[in-house]
Amino acid sequence: VLSPADKTNVKAAWGKVGGHAGEYGAEALERMFLSFPTTKTYFPHFDLSHGSAQVKGHGKKVADALTLAVGHVDDMPQALSALSDLHAHKLRVDPVNFKLLSHCLLVTLAAHLPAEFTPAVHASLDKFLASVSTVLTSKYR
């Protein structure tokens, strides 16, 4: 459960991401594909090379979903319901992959926002991404 301080930290950190959200989303995906090659199996139709338009496009989708979650932090299940349905019923993404992408997102944010990425912000973002992952996998049951 996100505390009021966590919510404040997440909103402030995501605010610093600003117009770079899509870029950071794509970078996190690239990190995931390189660090955890089995995740590539969900994207057989993508050009997974560095800077590809498809990875950039999906990175923007990831970032847009996170922006939506930040904006609806008190009601993520409702806000992310359609996305949860998509990943559970159509795409059938293994839930562990959300944890892998979350880790890569944290690394990407730490690399780009070193001054803002304090231990407290790190912990808040980790809890937030875990909450998003829980929501996205809630319809698997």
UniProtKB/Swiss-Prot annotation:
Positions of post-translational Phosphothreonine modification: 8, 108, 134, 137
Pfam families per the UniProt record, alphabetical:
Globin
Q: Which Gene Ontology MF annotations are present?
A: haptoglobin binding; heme binding; iron ion binding; organic acid binding; oxygen binding; oxygen carrier activity; peroxidase activity
Q: Which residues bind heme b?
A: 87
Give the modified residues of type N6-acetyllysine: 16
The free-text tissue note of the record is:
Red blood cells.
Family annotation (PROSITE patterns): GLOBIN
Q: What binding partners and quaternary form does the record give? A: Heterotetramer of two alpha chains and two beta chains.
Task: Report what the protein is called.
Answer: Hemoglobin subunit alpha-A/Q/R/T
Q: Which organism is it from?
A: Macaca fascicularis
